[in-house]
Amino acid sequence: MVNLQGSICSLRALEPSDLDVMYGWENEVELWRTSGATAPFSRHQLTSLIAEQQYDIYATRQLRLVIEADIDGEHRVVGAIDLLDFDPQNRRAGVGVIISAEYRRRGFAADALRCVEEYARGVLMLHQLWCSVAEDNVASIALFAGAGYEQCGIRREWILTPQGALSEILFQKIL
């Protein structure tokens, strides 16, 4: 049985009440390089994205799940985990994780990743998950390598920044 409850966090569907926290994440300029964003998101755009989540992943080809944890006796949103570029024919999807700054380094990303892998394998019947990580994103490299993802390629000088070009490391995990 697939359980979206990890040992320290749980995953749930997006709700309209998640708009404010999503607005903060999606408009954090430091994260744009990771997400590929180049401009701010409006509340209207994010409201539409939340509404779109009511549709099946087979229609939208993506799914965002909210990561919740019990913090000081209260259920709090600590992050989100995405399945993206869902490809049911080849039974694979990309995966991405965001944890709010104040909740990082507590194991939430690793626990959420285990949950979404179980969901991907047990419900979506996926064969593999993949991700791409900038070479300077040490925390994400450690997360995916520690979860058994294997480096399967490098895109040299793939991400342009004001400081210069960064390579992107490709990881995949056969489920």
Features from the language model and the residues they span:
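A generic secondary-structure signal
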Residues: 52-53, 119
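Acyl-donor (CoA/ACP) binding surface of acyl/acetyltransferases
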Residues: 1-10, 14-18, 26-27, 72-175
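Short acidic-aromatic low-complexity motifs
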Residues: 17-20, 58-60
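Short regulatory "switch" loops immediately downstream of catalytic or recognition motifs
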Residues: 66-72
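A short helix-loop-beta-strand connector motif used in the catalytic cores of GNAT acetyltransferases and
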Residues: 53-66
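Conserved GNAT-fold acetyl-CoA-binding loop/helix
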Residues: 30-52
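Sparse recognition of residues in long alpha-helices and their boundaries
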Residues: 38-39, 62, 160, 168
